Amino acid sequence: MLMPKRTKYRKQMKGRNRGKAHRGNSIAFGDIAIKAIEHGRIDSRQIESARVAMTRHIKRAGKVWIRVFPDKPLTAKPLETRMGKGKGSVEKWVMNIKPGRIVYEMLGIEEGLAREALALAQSKLPFKTKIVTCESENEIY
């Protein structure tokens, strides 16, 4: 599972996920990618399950880049616990995703096969996405 090695503070405030992505919104390494088209939150398990689905479909050919990293701790209190007595313990690590963010990239795979693999990964993600190529990337949403 992806998570930071160490953080300055153990717990964070929830915050708000507004606006569109100004960083990580263009293809940098590959030639075909998955781009988010709505707000969402992705955790380390979802990142890993989508990566496994893609790499199994392409049979380890080519190269896959994960362009997101879960660096925000999500806390939860145990079930059937009364309110109060402090904030819950860290349950999982997440990343807030804004529209326009590139989530995965691929290189060195035939486009038809790459689209099938990315479609498998799309079904594992909790927000709407679209497949973009270097040529079609200028269309933001």
Swiss-Prot record:
Write the record's keywords in alphabetical order, separated by commas: Ribonucleoprotein, Ribosomal protein, RNA-binding, rRNA-binding, tRNA-binding
Molecular-function annotations in GO: rRNA binding; structural constituent of ribosome; tRNA binding
The segment annotated Disordered runs over 1-23
Q: Does the keyword Ribonucleoprotein apply?
A: yes
GO CC list: cytosolic large ribosomal subunit
Q: Which Pfam families match?
A: Ribosomal_L16
Domain of life assignment: Bacteria
Q: Extract the Gene3D superfamilies matched here.
A: Ribosomal protein L10e/L16
Q: Name one GO biological process term.
A: translation
* InterPro entries per record: Ribosomal_uL16, Ribosomal_uL16_bact-type, Ribosomal_uL16_CS, Ribosomal_uL16_dom, Ribosomal_uL16_sf
Q: Which PANTHER family match?
A: 50S/60S RIBOSOMAL PROTEIN L16 (PTHR12220), LARGE RIBOSOMAL SUBUNIT PROTEIN UL16M (PTHR12220:SF13)
How is this protein organized at the quaternary level? Part of the 50S ribosomal subunit.
Task: Give the family, as the similarity comment puts it.
Answer: Belongs to the universal ribosomal protein uL16 family.
The function of this protein is:
Binds 23S rRNA and is also seen to make contacts with the A and possibly P site tRNAs.
Task: Output the NCBIfam families linked to this UniProt entry.
Answer: rplP_bact
- Supply the name of the protein: Large ribosomal subunit protein uL16
